[in-house]
């Protein structure tokens, strides 16, 4: 029953593709066979003229491409600034982790100290070429620093996943809302036609003295209110298209939703499982807190613990550039040294203060992670409580739509066959065309209310999926990105499917 009422709203869209096909087939037949007009076979000018006329009619048909929800989500994630920033943070965290591990690998530097001879005692080695190597051998703090960098990289990766899910949620919600508004605009357009017909009927009845002038004014008020509703829906659709264009980078005029690409949204509840939920955002906060904790432990291990480093140096010296032989009897050209350095900080107030600072940062990030977890639990409870109310409102709106549809069928039947009552004074009055137009307008209003209630329910369900950490599971049901039809201005005969009941 609901599907029948929704099909009427999309009849104009489906006729676009069918009209294009009919014109193409007619033109093909005219071009091949010619036209017989008044007994004369016209095979020259008339087929060409009709072909040009048909092409003009075909160009007037508003053909457009439709973009699937999967395409919108994919483009939004690629174009999102928050996702790009999260990707940059992930690459930075990965580089820091690599840096923490590479301190154990000796580095190699080469250089030269060529210059004129010094005056008096030589101030430096007359080095033609030199090479130095150094690395960390052992540190009590470095192990904690590596763990901190690994946890920070995990936090950045989870934050990237969280940013992608949030972008997908925003794009999906906007896309579904635009699809709902487009369906409501179709209903409003039909309402406008019925309201115009109602005004014509009231005008005739008022002129005939059947209805009062106030009834005519009421019909005009209804027409004005429906016109205002159309303007509101048009502006709302324009804003939603602009939002999707900003998210995806697509032209505004190319964004037309494909209703069949929207998968069903599962009716989950916050009490479905008694286990604690952890979204990518919460997991990222916990990983960040763990990273700060490891950083604080590493800073606390600096004082009173040995630090061992490795070093090696080679010099190729020359006496012709300096007067080394005057002061050093056993001067050699090639010199090499290697060894380790052991340092034990006994009294270092700077590192002690740094450890206290890191401990405070670790405590702060831990409290922030716990606060985010509590806020997420509160959001789940709020959404779970509102879902029951929204579901009930959706059921009521659908029942009202079904009742209005049944009442419309009754009016149509009585208008066609009569209500079976006599012309007695106490008998029920016969149904008039005015009642039919009012029933049509009411049925379309109830259909729009039902579509709006269903969108509110879908939006709440998506938000709950996100809060429960199941957003990725729903995104997997979107399927591949698709583009149905061709851009506006390119002829095509793609039919627009009917919406799901």
Residue ranges of model-derived segments:
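Acidic, low-complexity, intrinsically disordered peripheral segments
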Residues: 417, 421-428, 442-501
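Periplasmic alpha-helical coiled-coil/stalk elements that build and connect Gram-negative outer-membrane
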Residues: 8, 166-283, 383-390, 410, ...
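Sec/SRP-type N-terminal targeting helices
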Residues: 84-88, 101-105, 137-164, 214, ...
């Amino acid at each position: 029953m609901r599907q029948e009422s929704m099909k009427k709203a999309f009849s104009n869209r489906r006729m676009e593709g069918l009209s294009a096909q009919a014109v193409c087939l007619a033109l093909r037949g005219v071009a091949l066979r010619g036209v017989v007009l008044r007994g004369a076979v016209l095979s020259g000018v008339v087929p060409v003229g009709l072909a040009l006329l048909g092409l003009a009619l075909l160009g007037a048909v508003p053909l457009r491409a439709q973009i699937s929800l999967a395409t919108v989500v994919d483009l939004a994630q690629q174009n999102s600034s928050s996702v790009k920033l999260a990707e940059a943070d992930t690459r930075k965290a990965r580089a820091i982790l690599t840096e923490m591990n590479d301190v154990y690998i000796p580095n190699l530097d080469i250089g030269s100290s060529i210059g004129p001879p010094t005056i008096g005692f030589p101030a430096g080695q007359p080095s033609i070429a030199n090479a130095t190597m150094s690395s960390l051998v052992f540190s009590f703090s470095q192990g904690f620093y590596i763990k901190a960098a690994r946890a920070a990289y995990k936090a950045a990766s989870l934050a990237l996943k969280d940013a992608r899910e949030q972008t997908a949620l925003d794009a999906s919600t906007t896309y579904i809302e635009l699809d709902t508004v487009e369906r409501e605009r179709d209903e409003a357009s039909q309402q406008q036609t019925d309201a115009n017909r109602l005004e014509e009927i009231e005008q005739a009845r008022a002129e005939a003295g059947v209805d009062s002038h106030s009834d005519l004014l009421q019909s005009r008020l209804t027409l004005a209110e429906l016109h205002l509703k159309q303007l509101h829906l048009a502006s709302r659709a324009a804003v939603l298209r602009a939002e999707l264009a900003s998210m995806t980078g697509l032209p505004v005029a190319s964004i037309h939703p494909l209703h069949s690409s929207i998968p069903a949204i599962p009716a989950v509840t916050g009490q479905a499982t008694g286990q604690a939920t952890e979204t990518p955002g919460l997991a990222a906060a916990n990983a960040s807190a763990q990273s700060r904790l490891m950083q604080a432990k590493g800073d606390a291990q600096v004082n009173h613990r040995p630090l061992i480093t490795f070093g090696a140096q080679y010099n190729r010296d020359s006496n012709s550039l300096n007067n080394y032989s005057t002061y050093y009897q056993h001067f050699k050209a090639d010199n090499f040294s290697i060894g380790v350095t052991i340092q034990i900080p006994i009294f270092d107030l700077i590192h002690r203060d740094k450890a206290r600072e890191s401990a405070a940062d670790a405590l702060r990030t831990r409290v922030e992670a716990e606060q985010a977890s509590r806020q997420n639990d509160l959001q789940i409870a709020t959404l779970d409580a509102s879902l029951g109310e929204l579901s009930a409102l959706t059921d009521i709106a659908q029942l009202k739509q079904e009742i209005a549809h049944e009442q419309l069928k009754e009016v149509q039947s009585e208008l066609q066959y009569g209500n079976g009552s006599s012309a007695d004074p106490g008998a029920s009055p016969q149904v008039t065309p005015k009642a039919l137009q009012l029933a049509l307008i009411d049925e379309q209003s109830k259909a729009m209310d039902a579509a709006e209630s269903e969108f509110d329910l879908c939006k709440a369900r998506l938000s709950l999926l996100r809060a429960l950490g199941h957003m990725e599971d729903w995104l997997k049901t979107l399927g591949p990105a698709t583009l149905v039809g061709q851009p506006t201005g390119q002829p095509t005969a793609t039919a627009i499917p009917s919406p799901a009941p």
